């Protein structure tokens, strides 16, 4: 089905969060090294509470988060300190990180703020030990080369990494993060994805951003006419952005259709809670049979709508379940999907009878501890009443495939307040003017094709590679571009597909090997086995010795003479055409220890001698 996004009034904007590849964190001198949870050296526990803003208001998103009283566990390392623990004041803002953000702002033709003030953004989901995230506005009002507007660029501290629901790792907390916010100027799913790709290209062009899964996240703001602004958090895959937008448009259209149907039916929400625990004492449903309390409500004339699909894999009932889960319950049951899950038809009949439900009504039940059931039912009633409004303003999280689930209400202005522990930073015109704009990756691709003779796809791979700088350094050191590309790109890709841990190989080790190859000390044919050895943790010297043990010219001559003698009849029969096959046998035996040109020269002389004596 073709969707007319212009007719629907689609408006979208995007926020991109990218980790910066700095030596130190934003407000302490700890390294920005990602660790494994098993390497943790200690732990501590916290409960988090929301604080009121300067105006005495409590942020609605934080208020909802406080519904769940949770104890958070934090893992510490020998690369984290008391700043991450929120037991020591923050150090001054990282100047290296600020220069990177200012450079990106300059690329986007933005105006830097004259003085940077750090703010506190209230976050009590456990991802910050302090209960807030530090963020600073750096620049405003810019444009991308494609025309999309950039509203703001901020410098933030990264959140802690969630290991489990209430367990967080502090290795990531405090890594400098750039937040780029576009204006709501996009009107098709494809435009959103293209804009994200363009921003990603600019970020990578700096050579100062981290790479890998989790280092970049896209938040998408979407609304349609008569709908509402919804923020979708944490889209990590660029290729999924357009699909996420399409599915959110589908969801909002479906919710608006449900709104109109509810009005047409004269539907209503019955707020009386009914205890139906006794109806399921002998149920085949393990969840219901073992539950200490089962409560039910009747949604008048909601039949068929709670179970209606609003986007792939999601129904209106899924939305209600998301709200209920905020109270700690596992979910809900509703009569649009029953009998099922061990609930029999007789139990459904008795349930409807207990609530005086007609065939036009939908009954929802929740099973858990009494207090949780009460809380969950109030949330379900709240979400059911929102259905009469259409689309609620929400922050949502992306699910696999591109559909989304409710996270929390959209935060308000009460979420932000000044950070009193961090000094302001002046941004002088001289400082901003001194920053050099990096070469954009599109221009790098064109240059690699023209200067180095690389094919377009190879040039693109090399330009986007995190080893790009080392590749250029190798060429400036006298290494031929084709060999440098093999070493820093194509061979590493092949080895990675074979399972080699190529991320362990240091750029300087590859460069050292290339210098040895260029000097003739190591044959270029040995490049792949040498890189394999480097991936296993060998030093360049050890890797070369293992993969390409030195063979003297005298030893090589003996090897060639022996192989030629063994194949004398074949050589006499084929003449000079035998050179290729015999060359392959020799190269296999010397295993790249000798340059192919030298082997070819000695072999041709040996074959010539055999043919001369024939």
From Swiss-Prot:
InterPro entries: Asn/Gln-tRNA_amidoTrfase_suB/E, Asn/Gln-tRNA_Trfase_suB/E_cat, Asn/Gln_amidotransferase, Asn/Gln_tRNA_amidoTrase-B-like, GAD-like_sf, GAD_dom, GatB_C_1, GatB_Yqey_C_2. One of its GO terms (cellular component) is cytoplasm. One of its GO terms (molecular function) is ATP binding. GO terms for biological process: glutaminyl-tRNAGln biosynthesis via transamidation; translation. It catalyses: L-glutamyl-tRNA(Gln) + L-glutamine + ATP + H2O = L-glutaminyl-tRNA(Gln) + L-glutamate + ADP + phosphate + H(+). Pfam families: GAD (PF02938), GatB_N (PF02934), GatB_Yqey (PF02637). Keywords: ATP-binding, Ligase, Nucleotide-binding, Protein biosynthesis. The keyword Ligase applies. PROSITE patterns: GATB. Allows the formation of correctly charged Gln-tRNA(Gln) through the transamidation of misacylated Glu-tRNA(Gln) in organisms which lack glutaminyl-tRNA synthetase. The reaction takes place in the presence of glutamine and ATP through an activated gamma-phospho-Glu-tRNA(Gln). The GatDE system is specific for glutamate and does not act on aspartate. Belongs to the GatB/GatE family. GatE subfamily. This is Glutamyl-tRNA(Gln) amidotransferase subunit E. It comes from Methanospirillum hungatei JF-1 (strain ATCC 27890 / DSM 864 / NBRC 100397 / JF-1).
């Amino acid at each position: 089905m073709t969707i007319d996004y212009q007719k629907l009034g689609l408006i979208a904007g995007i926020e991109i969060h990218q980790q910066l590849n700095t030596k130190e964190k934003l407000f302490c001198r700890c390294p920005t090294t990602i660790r494994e949870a098993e390497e943790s050296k200690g732990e501590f526990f916290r409960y988090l509470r929301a604080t009121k803003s300067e105006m005495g208001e409590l942020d609605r998103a934080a208020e909802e988060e406080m519904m769940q009283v949770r104890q958070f566990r934090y893992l510490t390392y020998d690369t984290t300190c008391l700043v991450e623990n929120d037991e020591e004041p923050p150090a001054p803002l990282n100047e290296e990180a600020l220069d990177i953000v200012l450079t990106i702002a300059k690329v986007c033709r933005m105006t830097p703020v004259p003085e940077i003030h750090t703010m506190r953004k209230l976050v009590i989901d456990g991802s910050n030990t302090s209960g807030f995230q530090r963020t600073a506005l750096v620049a405003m009002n810019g444009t991308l080369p494609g025309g999309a507007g950039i509203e703001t660029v901020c410098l933030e501290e990264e959140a802690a990494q969630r290991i489990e629901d209430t367990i967080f790792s502090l290795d990531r907390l405090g890594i400098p993060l750039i937040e780029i916010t576009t204006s709501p100027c996009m009107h098709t799913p494809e435009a959103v994805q293209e804009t994200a790709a363009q921003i990603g290209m600019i970020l990578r062009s700096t050579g100062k951003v981290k790479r890998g899964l989790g280092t970049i996240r896209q938040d998408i703001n979407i609304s349609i006419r008569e709908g509402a602004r919804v923020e979708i958090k944490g889209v990590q895959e660029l290729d999924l952005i357009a699909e996420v937008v399409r599915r959110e448009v589908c969801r909002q259209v479906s919710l608006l259709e449900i709104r109109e149907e509810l009005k047409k039916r004269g539907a209503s929400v019955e707020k009386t809670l009914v205890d139906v625990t006794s109806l399921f004492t002998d149920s085949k449903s393990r969840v219901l049979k073992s539950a200490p309390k089962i409560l039910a409500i009747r949604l008048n004339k909601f039949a068929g709508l709670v179970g209606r699909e609003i986007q792939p894999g999601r129904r209106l009932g899924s939305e209600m379940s998301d709200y209920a889960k905020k109270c700690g319950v596992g979910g809900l049951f509703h009569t649009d999907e029953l009998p099922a899950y061990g609930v029999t038809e007789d139990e459904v009949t008795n349930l409807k009878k207990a609530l005086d439900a007609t065939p036009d009504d939908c009954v929802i039940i929740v099973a858990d501890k009494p207090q949780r059931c009460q809380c969950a039912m109030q949330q379900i009633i709240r979400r059911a009443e929102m259905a009469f409004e259409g689309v609620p303003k929400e922050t949502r999280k992306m699910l696999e495939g591109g559909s989304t689930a409710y996270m929390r209400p959209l935060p308000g202005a009460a979420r932000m307040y000044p950070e009193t522990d961090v000094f302001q930073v002046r941004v002088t015109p001289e400082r901003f003017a001194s920053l050099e704009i990096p070469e954009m990756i599109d221009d790098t691709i064109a240059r690699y094709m023209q200067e180095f003779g690389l094919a377009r796809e190879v040039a693109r791979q090399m330009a986007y590679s995190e080893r790009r700088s080392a590749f250029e350094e190798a060429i400036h050191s006298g290494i031929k571009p084709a060999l440098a590309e093999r070493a820093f790109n194509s061979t590493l890709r092949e080895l990675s597909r074979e399972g080699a841990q190529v991320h362990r190989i240091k750029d300087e080790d590859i460069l050292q090997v290339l210098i040895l190859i260029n000097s003739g000390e190591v044959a270029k044919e040995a490049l792949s086995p040498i890189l394999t050895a480097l991936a296993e943790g060998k030093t360049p010297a050890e890797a070369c010795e293992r993969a390409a043990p030195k063979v003297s010219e005298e030893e090589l001559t003996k090897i060639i003479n022996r192989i030629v003698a063994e194949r004398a009849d074949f050589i006499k029969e084929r003449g000079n055409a035998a050179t290729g096959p015999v060359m392959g046998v020799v190269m296999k035996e010397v295993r790249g220890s000798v340059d192919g040109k030298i082997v070819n020269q000695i072999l041709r002389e040996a074959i010539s001698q055999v043919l001369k004596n024939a």
